[in-house]
Amino acid sequence: MLDTIRSWVNETNLHFATSRRPCTEFKELFAGYFPESFLARSYYVEVPEVPLPPLEYVSQAGLDDLFGQSVAGLTLDDTYYLTPSAANNLRIHFHELVHVAQWQQLGYRNFISRYLEEISIYGYDQMPLERMAYDLDARFVAGGPVVDVRQTVRKLLEDNDTDVSLRSHEEIE
C-alpha cells in the first residue's frame, strides 16, 4: 500500500508542478524558524479543492473520517496544497511547512507509516505528528521565542516520544 500511496503522491505533485510556488516568499515572515534554503525547496499550490487520494486508498488506510471532512490543506512531501481561504492564512502555511520538515526528517516510508499508525491509535486531533505541527504553529502565532523548526522537529522525532507536545520539551528552547 505504501508504494501505491507514493505513486499517487508523485503523480499529484507532477500534475501540479507548473503551479507550485516556492515558499521563499515567506522568508522574512518565517526568518529564524525556517532557513531560506529549506523554503526554496518547499512549495505550495493554491487549488479550488485539496487533492485527495482515491477513495479506495482512503478506505484501505482507515482514513474515511479524516478525508470525509472539509480539508483546507494537505502536505505531500515537499509540496502542500491549500484552498483559497487557507492560502491567505499564514498560520496554515507555517503548519504545513512543519509537515514538510517531518517528511524530510522521516523520509517518505517512515512518514506515511507513522502518520497512518498514529491516526489509527490516537485519532487526528491527538496524533503526535499533528500535535507537533499545531504546537509549533501556535508558538509562531503567539510570538513566542523563535525556534529552528527543523531542529525542533528532528529533536522531537529522535526522542521518539509519543507525547511530542512542546510543553513537555522545554529543553528544546
Where do the language-model regions lie?
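N-terminal targeting leaders of exported, membrane, and organelle-targeted proteins
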Residues: 1-11, 99
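Conserved N-terminal glycine/acidic-rich loop preference
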Residues: 8-9, 51-53
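Metalloprotease/metallohydrolase-associated module, dominated by Zn2+-dependent proteases
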Residues: 10-14, 18-40, 44-48, 62-71, ...
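Short, surface-exposed loop/helix-turn segments at secondary-structure junctions
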Residues: 54-64
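Glycine-rich, acidic and aromatic/proline-enriched surface loops and short helix-turn segments
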Residues: 103-107
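Short alpha-helix carrying the canonical HExxH Zn2+-binding catalytic motif
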Residues: 85-102
